[in-house]
Regions:
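Flanking helices and flexible, charged tails adjoining ferredoxin-like Fe-S electron-transfer domains
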Residues: 2-5, 37-38, 43-65, 86-168
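A positional/architectural concept
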Residues: 16-27, 33, 38-45
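The canonical Cys-X-X-Cys-His
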Residues: 21, 68, 99
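Local sequence-structure signature of Cys/Sec-based thiol-disulfide redox active-site neighborhoods
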Residues: 4-12
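A generic structural signal for beta-strand entry/edge sites
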Residues: 7, 79-81, 113
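Ordered, amphipathic secondary-structure segments that act as subunit-interaction surfaces
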Residues: 59-81
Length: 168
């Protein structure tokens, strides 16, 4: 399967908040284990025990691309991903403010935006996530997987409701 046919799929219910995905991403791209240099970010709500890895969704009609005043962001048709041309990027952060997923990050050292590039088809966050909270799957399977998960959740909810009703 070509990289263009695959996407990152994130299951926040599996994420434990270990942040290993952030570390391996930063090491892969910048050679340092600094989570602030990562292209994937784990948003944490510690009191609720909720951790959500956030990464570029590689939107077809990307707000970051449409909002860039210097056209530094484009859609690579071959790899089916959104890319930043760092030679053109002026670091204005417009893309950061318009991304509906909060997936565009700003590198304060280089004064440029950074975002997931899918590691050229071999995402390291997936490789190192032992619990598979982050996976790299066939794009066509995402909708099917989400429907199966919704059906599973509905089944669990029905069983809980039936058990609750039986106790009344």
């Amino acid at each position: 399967m070509e990289p263009a046919d695959k996407v990152l799929m994130i299951d926040h219910e599996k994420c434990t908040g270990c942040r290993l995905c952030e570390l391996v991403c930063a090491v892969k791209h910048d050679g340092i284990s600094n989570p602030m240099r990562s292209r994937i970010r784990v948003v944490k709500w510690e009191q609720e025990g909720l951790y959500i890895p956030m990464s570029c969704q590689q939107c077809q009609d990307a707000p970051c691309m449409n909002g860039c005043p210097v056209n530094a962001i484009s859609h690579n048709e071959t790899l089916n991903r959104i890319e930043v041309d760092y030679d053109i990027c002026i670091g204005c952060r417009t893309c950061v403010s318009v991304c509906p997923f909060g997936a565009m990050n700003f590198n304060t050292i280089d004064r440029k935006v950074i975002k997931c590039d899918l590691c050229d088809g071999d995402p390291q966050c997936v490789r190192f996530c032992d619990i598979k909270a982050v996976d790299y799957v066939d794009a066509g399977d995402v909708s099917i997987m989400k429907k199966k998960e919704a059906a599973r959740r509905l089944s669990v909810a029905n069983k809980k409701a039936a058990a609750l009703q039986a106790t009344m």
